[in-house]
UniProtKB/Swiss-Prot annotation:
Species of origin: Homo sapiens
Lineage, top ranks: Eukaryota, Metazoa, Chordata, Craniata, Vertebrata
This protein's name: Inward rectifier potassium channel 18
Record note on what altering residue 43 to C does: Found in a patient with sporadic periodic paralysis; uncertain significance; decreases potassium inward and outward currents density; reduces cell surface abundance; reduces conductance; dominant negative mutation
Record localization: Cell membrane; Endoplasmic reticulum
Intramembrane segments: 130-146
Biased composition (Basic and acidic residues): 396-414
Residue ranges crossing the lipid bilayer per the database entry: 78-104, 156-183
Amino acid sequence: MTAASRANPYSIVSLEEDGLHLVTMSGANGFGNGKVHTRRRCRNRFVKKNGQCNIAFANMDEKSQRYLADMFTTCVDIRWRYMLLIFSLAFLASWLLFGVIFWVIAVAHGDLEPAEGHGRTPCVMQVHGFMAAFLFSIETQTTIGYGLRCVTEECLVAVFMVVAQSIVGCIIDSFMIGAIMAKMARPKKRAQTLLFSHNAVVALRDGKLCLMWRVGNLRKSHIVEAHVRAQLIKPRVTEEGEYIPLDQIDIDVGFDKGLDRIFLVSPITILHEIDEASPLFGISRQDLETDDFEIVVILEGMVEATAMTTQARSSYLANEILWGHRFEPVLFEEKNQYKIDYSHFHKTYEVPSTPRCSAKDLVENKFLLPSANSFCYENELAFLSRDEEDEADGDQDGRSRDGLSPQARHDFDRLQAGGGVLEQRPYRRGSEI
């Protein structure tokens, strides 16, 4: 097969001609799986971080006719400047059209000729030229009514044109007001106040590897019936040799259990359990560094004020997924309310105890899980929060030298020694949602 025959993007190319580099990962100590990895240029995003789809239409037959057939949707979808320009031109065209008609009527009736007597009544009073006819057209359609120019009973066609212009003016006004109101009430801009974390993370949750990302609502108004979904997009070659450039695979975020429906009052971490049905089941940390895929995440719901459905989108490339990280807490309890600190929304911290193997190898017990009592960032934050509460109460006598209260020091020693699981106690802050 020659290089020219492989110019087709759907043809199968060899590794040498495509510029791919082979890297073999060792399987020792759980840091590899013995697979052959390839490093290649990352493909373009299908969905940008701001939610826009990275697509361009080409070679569309009868595109203009199809768009004009759905004029209302076209006016709602286009930019404000173009919509206002279209309506301004529509008003100007209607004024000019009927101005020309009234001028022609005046010419045909002889109203522009010098009057020899006072016995003839003109079709339109005080219309002696085109400019006067144009002004009469504007006064008729906008119902200004200065009182100088008016139609008479002399010409039936002039009366009919006044009625026709009034109807046309009402149609243009109604169409313009409807399009502007529909454009203003669209929930598209509501997605600007729905936030996705910059990165997704992979970490252990209840003994299982999970893919997690965070969503938040920057407004106090709620998103009714909010629910999330996700898809993995990557190229694939079928068993028959067919090349699918963007194969879409659903990622389960708890649809069967109802976990995909969320109460988005505070930032929430969305969780996808990497199990046998997950497309990420066989991907390890090394695979993640070399693989080429995109995870599209979607948040949908109804705007509380208008009950219209809105949708926010984002995506994560493989190099934007942090293996062995967790999100920092953003929800803290202070006095009689909860405080959300969005400065920590995108921040993560590393969990070194996260296994680097795939979930498949983890299920097959090839690698040991870290201790359930491992001391982590949330525990440290809880201890510090408890100390701050004790300090606010003025109880400083029983503190140890390192700044921890005796109870916090006791729990810390138990965690470090692996002596058991802490009993549940309410904390002032530091609880992640």
